[in-house]
Amino acid sequence: MEPWYRVATPRKEVREGRSFNPDEFAIHLEQVVAKNAPEDYREPKQFFARTCWTRALRDHAGMVLRRLSGETANTAPVLTLITQFGGGKTHTLTALYHLVTTGAKASEYQGVGDLLKEAGIRAVPEARVAAFVGNAWDPKDGRETPWIDIARQLAGDKGVNELGPAARTTPPGTESLARVFKAAGGPVLLLFDEVLNFLNRHRGMADQFHAFIQNLTVATTGTTRGAAVISLPRSQVEMTDWDMQWQDKITKVVRRVAKDLIANDETEISEVVRRRLFEDIGSDRIRKSVAKTYAAWCFERRAQLPPEWTAVDSAATEAKAREYLRSRFEVCYPFHPATLSVFQRKWQALSQYQQTRGTLASGVDPTASPHKWQRPSVGYIIPATFGYAHWDADGQLVLGWINEVPDQEACETSESGT
């Protein structure tokens, strides 16, 4: 059996070990907008080449594009993006930004053509975009308040004038915001990220910002070609009572008119990780052969193996159960399904674990240096010999070796048995 590292080819930066800290995989929306983000995130073509179009991302983007195209069915004027820490919310916001700032040309990018067919629209609508990133926003001349900044992004000085002179101290009402949208001269998309971080840093503006968001959601509802996407954290990691109070207030205001979206479907994490870490996962023939061999071996020994290895529905027929297990091994390749299961079952319970981003960072070392962690005959990246990441420069998550004895014994037997 071919070992995985002779079949799959990691990306160049992974082979060189350049990406290790979770921050290496983090997207900063404000940098994308300012055109000073790393090239993989800054350039739309490269960004979409590395984007996994998960079901969640296709649904989110499709709803927004339909709304901006003037469609009202199967969409909403305000969307809340619910996500685990490091779970893909900024990737979704960045995808939306690149789509609507590129417009019709975006159909040339990987996956966008299929997205348009699924959404039932002919082309990507070009829109004026205002992005508010709370952990990067501070007042300065020309953007004394968040609403002045947003008005300027949408319609320049004309947009700011529509707010009136009181905007320097008072949040605008729905009519003023409607005038700003009109001044933009076309579809408008509003992207909000890290709102709670902004409130925490500018507590004196909390009540004003709360009123602004309330009026903004109402004004957006009154448009036919406008949408607002607001990211809200699912977890309450390191939140103070004040943080939780304001998160609850903002959430209640937004959800009066918003549709909730979940940023990353956990069942598709494997494809996200594969797309980001590997430039090629080898021939279909080899992958299918390895998956079939492993799945057959595990199915015959399913009573002795940990349940997360097989996840077989006892109510299914034997043929369906075998096929499900085979497809699971094939979809996860070159990662053993149990490897990804460790992240989803156990690590997510850790308060500082960053879901997709943490999985990516942890997968770099064994992917870049397979001979260090794997035996020559191993067909998959398996959990028992997986050297997990340890990043501690800022006192962040520090994890050593994970060595699950039942999994290790099963893997050892699997190697000799297959």
Predicted regions and their residues:
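Conserved P-loop NTPase catalytic core
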Residues: 118, 125-140, 144, 218-222, ...
